[in-house]
């Protein structure tokens, strides 16, 4: 979902009902936008004056101009030059090299770096694929200043010497995950594997993190019986997952379990993976709440003074670190050996009866009843001190919720099963947003095909050549389906891709499988007709081969679209060849997790003039969101909409936005007729999002259109692009740019190219 423009400043709340929340909120209060920043000498954005104006910025983020590595830099190739064993050795040495400016708990930074890696990747949400570790976004606002990320600025500074040593060959995004892995290995845990390949961003992502205008505030993201707004996957603004003290700090493990189940499911984790992650993660390290944050902490990094050089939460109480550290406001360790992989978390969870207590910061946590185990846990810095183990309200949820308890008890009784479950869940957590295995780089990646990776069979046959391609194009165009249907099918398959988490796309031909074949936007009956035809072409060709040569349905889908576009261009006297590279494969239903793929179903697709009921964003905002997930620029989005309109591929088969007298001909008629001043536009009275184009002289209807169509004449930036393509000298450019943008979408999932 697109980020929303707040009409008021994002001020931090100074009071909430929860003491922990209040304390942390005050500690980051300087994140409140200063009104003086909008005053003298500062330019005001257009959205300041016109808040409802369409925001095209998502299509311009992470521009090549902001990347100091340059557009030709290939990170995967650079990563391959690393001696990963040497990198891991350097990280391992760092883990026990405690620094005076930020001393390591128990003399070992391992748990600290596990938290860093978890919080880097743990922002991922399945609904729209946003968040996650890709890009190293934890370095930037707002994530670097989220209340849940207190002190992680120090973790990244501790890693700087290693990042500095390996430079561009090791991204921050990869380094944070790799360090978490090495940390756990150094503490005796067996990691399932690691894959590199996460490129760094150099600016913050534009992500909708929630409607709130204050950190950790309120239930604005909830409706009804605690229904969390889509696409969000955290209970409050500024948290990775859930409030450790329970919903709104209510200290109730049962309601906390409901929050945990909802939120973890939204990041694609089932109950078993959830229990494994919580129990495994809390085996390591401790929480920090030595003092009240509102009395001790300076602002977060985004609001800190310039001399702090990007660090935040400066602590003016006691030593300012070590035994005086303040992070969550909760205080203590879950186990006796916080820097070793043990079963002590589950031992303690089930071995003690737990009662509420208050941390020194005033947060509610739990300790064993009747002072049992009061001296079990060594202090992280003061050798003469010992403490009782602690649990969060969310920890006790694993004991009190019947389903979680059953899993936790099984893990407790079967340590090897627990270790394997945590290992696999950790690998999934840290790699979920990378997409298919084809994107993995390095020799430490497991060879398993997990369903969550959307596996696609490898090509084990000879690919079609140029002569075959021409033969198949003829077969496709001479068949029982129309060129428009071929284009529509190719777009439906390829446009399921999400650049946010590299899922979807035409490769795998999953458009013939559940759930995609049944999506409303794909017009299932028509789609089935086209797929039957394409599968017959595939069978006839493959049966006619004497050798090992074959063509996949996925390749035929793309080739059909290419042939149809070439045909449409030829009707306008343009001889074009749409680039086509075979090599796609076809997945099976057994390789396709229906529930997981269901989240890819478009709620809107402006390229097909489709808009479902229940969207919170307008059709034009959803168009930009769709273009963003397809990694399109403003001109690419514009030329694709215009070209697909004249190709007549609307999802419902209507002529809405088909601004041409020659449907099926690839030309710039859409822009020419949209900008034609002999037409005036008025809103239809009886239909939603329908506009009528009326001839100014005859007063007769000439066209119909949606808001998605009209935005290219209404929005000043889009109109500027439309004017280029509508000009008399732009006919060839329009066709060329359309073909280039089309080819880009068709190959978004070709990670092998």
UniProtKB/Swiss-Prot annotation:
Cross-linked residues, Tryptophyl-tyrosyl-methioninium (Trp-Tyr) (with M-267): 118-241
Enzyme class, UniProt record, top EC level: oxidoreductase
Record: active site: 119
Protein known as: Catalase-peroxidase
Subunit organization: Homodimer or homotetramer.
Site feature: Transition state stabilizer: 115
Keyword Repressor carried by entry: no
UniProt family annotation: Belongs to the peroxidase family. Peroxidase/catalase subfamily.
Species in which this protein is naturally found: Pseudoalteromonas atlantica (strain T6c / ATCC BAA-1087)
Covalent link Tryptophyl-tyrosyl-methioninium (Tyr-Met) (with W-118), residues: 241-267
Highest taxon listed in the record's lineage: Bacteria
Keyword Acyltransferase: no
One GO CC annotation: cytosol
A Pfam family assignment: peroxidase
Cofactor note: Binds 1 heme b (iron(II)-protoporphyrin IX) group per dimer.
Catalytically driven reaction(s): H2O2 + AH2 = A + 2 H2O; 2 H2O2 = O2 + 2 H2O
UniProt entry keywords in alphabetical sequence: Heme, Hydrogen peroxide, Iron, Metal-binding, Oxidoreductase, Peroxidase, Signal
Binding locations of heme b: 282
PTM info: Formation of the three residue Trp-Tyr-Met cross-link is important for the catalase, but not the peroxidase activity of the enzyme.
The EC number(s) this enzyme carries: 1.11.1.21
Function: Bifunctional enzyme with both catalase and broad-spectrum peroxidase activity.
Cofactor: heme b
Biological process according to GO: cellular response to hydrogen peroxide; hydrogen peroxide catabolic process
Endpoints of the signal sequence: 1-39
GO molecular function (one): heme binding
């Amino acid at each position: 979902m697109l980020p929303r423009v707040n009409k008021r400043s994002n001020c931090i709340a100074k009071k909430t009902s929860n003491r922990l929340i209040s304390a942390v909120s005050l500690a980051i209060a300087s994140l409140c936008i200063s009104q003086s920043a909008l005053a003298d000498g500062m330019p005001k954005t257009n959205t300041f004056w016109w808040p409802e104006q369409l925001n095209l910025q998502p299509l311009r983020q992470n521009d090549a101009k902001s990347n100091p590595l340059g557009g030709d830099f290939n990170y995967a190739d650079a990563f391959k030059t690393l001696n990963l064993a040497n990198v891991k050795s350097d990280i391992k040495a760092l883990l026990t090299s405690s620094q005076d400016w930020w001393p390591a708990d128990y003399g070992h930074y391992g748990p600290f770096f596990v938290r860093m890696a978890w919080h880097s990747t743990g922002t991922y949400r399945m609904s729209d694929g946003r968040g996650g570790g890709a890009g190293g976004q934890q370095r930037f606002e707002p994530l670097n200043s989220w209340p849940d990320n207190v002190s992680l600025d120090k973790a990244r500074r501790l890693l700087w010497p290693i990042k500095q040593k390996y430079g561009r060959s090791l991204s921050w995004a990869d380094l944070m995950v790799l360090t978490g892995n090495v940390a756990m290995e150094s503490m005796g845990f067996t990691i399932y594997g690691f894959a590199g390949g996460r490129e760094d961003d150099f600016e913050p992502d534009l992500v909708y993190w929630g409607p709130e205008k204050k950190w950790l505030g309120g239930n604005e993201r909830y409706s009804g019986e605690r229904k969390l707004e889509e696409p969000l996957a955290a209970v409050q603004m500024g948290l990775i997952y859930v409030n450790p003290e329970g919903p709104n700090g209510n200290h109730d493990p049962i309601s906390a379990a409901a929050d945990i189940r909802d939120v973890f499911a939204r990041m694609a984790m089932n109950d078993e993976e959830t229990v494994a992650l919580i129990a495994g993660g809390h085996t390591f390290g401790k929480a920090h709440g030595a003092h009240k944050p509102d009395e001790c902490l300076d602002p977060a990094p985004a609001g800190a003074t310039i001399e702090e050089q990007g660090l935040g939460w400066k602590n003016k109480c006691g030593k300012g670190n070590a035994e005086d550290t303040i992070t969550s406001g909760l205080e203590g360790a879950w186990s006796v050996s916080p820097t070793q992989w043990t079963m002590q978390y589950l031992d303690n969870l089930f071995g003690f009866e737990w009662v509420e207590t208050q941390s020194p910061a005033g947060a509610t946590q739990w300790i064993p009843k009747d002072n049992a185990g009061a001296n079990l846990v060594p202090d992280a810095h003061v050798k003469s001190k010992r403490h009782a183990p602690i649990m969060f309200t969310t920890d006790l949820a694993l004991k009190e919720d019947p389903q979680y308890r059953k899993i936790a008890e099984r893990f407790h009784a079967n340590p090897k099963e627990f270790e394997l479950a945590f290992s696999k869940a950790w690998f999934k957590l840290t790699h979920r947003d990378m997409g298919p295995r084809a994107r993995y780089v390095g020799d430490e990646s497991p060879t398993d095909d997990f369903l969550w990776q959307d596996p696609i069979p490898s090509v084990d046959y000879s690919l079609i050549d140029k002569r075959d391609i021409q033969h198949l194009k003829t077969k496709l165009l001479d068949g029982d389906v129309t060129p428009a249907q071929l284009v529509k099918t190719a777009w439906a398959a390829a446009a399921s891709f999400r650049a946010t988490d590299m899922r979807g796309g035409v490769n795998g031909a999953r458009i013939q499988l559940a759930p995609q074949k049944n999506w409303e936007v794909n017009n299932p009956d028509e789609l089935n007709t086209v797929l039957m035809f394409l599968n017959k072409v595939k069978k006839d060709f493959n049966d006619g081969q004497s050798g090992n040569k074959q063509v996949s349905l996925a390749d035929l889908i793309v080739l059909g679209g290419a042939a149809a576009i070439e045909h449409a261009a030829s009707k306008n006297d343009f001889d074009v060849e749409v680039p086509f590279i075979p090599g796609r494969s076809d997945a099976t239903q057994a390789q396709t997790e229906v529930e997981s793929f269901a989240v890819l179903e478009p709620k809107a697709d402006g390229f097909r003039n489709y808009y479902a009921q229940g969207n919170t964003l307008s059709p034009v905002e959803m168009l930009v969101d769709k273009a963003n997930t397809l990694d399109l620029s403003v001109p690419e989005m514009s030329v694709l909409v215009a070209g697909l309109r004249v190709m007549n591929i609307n999802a419902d088969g209507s002529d809405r936005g088909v601004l041409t007298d020659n449907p099926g001909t690839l030309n710039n008629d859409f822009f020419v007729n949209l900008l034609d001043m002999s037409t005036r536009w008025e809103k239809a009275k009886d239909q939603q999002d329908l506009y009528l184009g009326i001839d100014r002289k005859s007063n007769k209807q000439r066209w119909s259109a949606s808001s998605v169509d009209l935005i290219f004449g209404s929005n000043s930036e889009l109109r500027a692009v439309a004017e280029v393509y509508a000009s008399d000298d732009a006919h060839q450019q329009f066709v060329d740019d359309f073909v280039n943008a089309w080819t880009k979408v068709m190959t978004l999932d070709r990670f092998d190219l």
